[in-house]
Amino acid sequence: MTSDSAIPNLGSNSAFSDAESNSTVVNPKSNSTSPDAESNSVIPDAELNSVLQYLKLNAEVTNVESDAPMVDEQVNSAPAHINLPDLDLDLEPISPATDVNSNSGWLSLNSPESVVDNKVKNNIQVQLKTEAGRLLVVLPTELQVPATEFTWSDIWQQLKFRLNAGDRLRTRNTTVHLVAYDRLLDGRQLQQLAETFSEVQLQLKSVATSRRQTAIAAVTSGYSVEQLQPETILSSEPKATSTPQADALYLEMTIRSGVEIRHPGTVILLGDINPGGIVVADGDILVWGRLRGIAHAGAGGNRDCLIMSLQMEPTQLRIADAVARAPEKSPTHFFPEVAHITSQGIRIVRSTDFSRNQISKINQTP
C-alpha cells in the first residue's frame, strides 16, 4: 500500500517540478500506483529524497556564489581584460609584444622570458650550416647555456621548427653531421633526431661529441663518431666573436604575434611579419611579403646591414644600435623598399632608388 506522502503532487508547482527541468524524466500523465507497473510516475522515497537533496544543495551553492566575490568570473575573463604594457620602442633590448590568445609554447623558438641579452641569445640556439655537401646541425654547448635552462625538449622542438619552416635550397637525402659538443644525448634522443631528419628527407650519419656517454650511444645506434676534446671547446670560446656569420636562414611561414625568430646570420622570409612578430638577425633581413612587426638587422653591431620588404609597414625597425619608429600615418601606396643607415639615422627608400644610390657610390669611389 502506497501512502499519499509517497506520491508527489505532479500538478502542483512543487520542488519536484523543478527537478524535471534538470533532466529528471517524469511522466505526469500516468496515475498508476502499482509498484510492479513499468511506468515511472511513482517516484520511490529514496529517489525523491535524493532529488530534493540535490535541489537543496544547488540552492545553497547558488546562494554562496551570489554572495561571494566574483573571483572565478574575473579569472576566466582575465585574458580579455589584461592591459598589456605598451611596447616601448626606445627600450633596450627589444621587448616582444605578447598576444595572450596566441599559441606561442614549439612555435615559440625563444620565449619572452628568455630575452635578456640579444648578442648572447642569438647564438644560444640550434644552428644549421652547410659544409662540403653535408648539413651541420650544431647544438649550443652547456658552457653557453646549462641543460637545466635549455632542455632536450627545447632542442628538439626548436630543430623541428627550423626544419619544417622550409629551406628551398635543401637537397634531399643530404647527410647530416650532428655537432653535439658537451651535450649529453642517449640512444632514444638520437633516434628521435634521426626520425625528425628522415621526415624532411635528411639522413643522420655522424655525431661529434666530447661526452663519452653520447659517443657510446651514437656507436650503438650505428652512427660514425668524431670524438671532440673538451679543451678544444674551451679554447674556442674566446674566439666566438671572430667567427663568420651562420648560413642564411630561409623560412616559408608567417611570423605571427608573439613569435620571435633569432638567427646569427641573414634571414630570408617568404611570408609576412604580423604586428607583434619579431625577427632579429646578425645579418640582413629580407621579407618577401608584408613587414608589419619588428625587424632588427645587424644585431651584432653591423651598421651596413639592410632590411628589405615588398611592403614596409613596420612597428619598429632596428639596424645595429639605430632605432626607427613607424610613421603616425600609414602610406597609401606601397613599393618594395629598403631600410639602411645614413648619417641622420635609419632611412627607408624605394628599392629602385636605393640601387641607383649604391651604383652612384660605387662609381664615385676612387
From Swiss-Prot:
Region span, MinC domain: 60-366
The keyword Cell cycle appears for this protein: yes
Region (Unknown): 1-59
Key words of the record: Cell cycle, Cell division, Septation
GO BP annotations, alphabetical order: cell morphogenesis; division septum assembly; regulation of cell septum assembly
Region (Disordered): 1-42
Biological role stated in the UniProt entry: Cell division inhibitor that blocks the formation of polar Z ring septums. Rapidly oscillates between the poles of the cell to destabilize FtsZ filaments that have formed before they mature into polar Z rings. Prevents FtsZ polymerization.
Subunit structure: Interacts with MinD and FtsZ.
UniProt family annotation: In the C-terminal section; belongs to the MinC family.
UniProt name for this protein: Probable septum site-determining protein MinC
Species the sequence originates in: Nostoc sp. (strain PCC 7120 / SAG 25.82 / UTEX 2576)
Gene that encodes the chain: minC
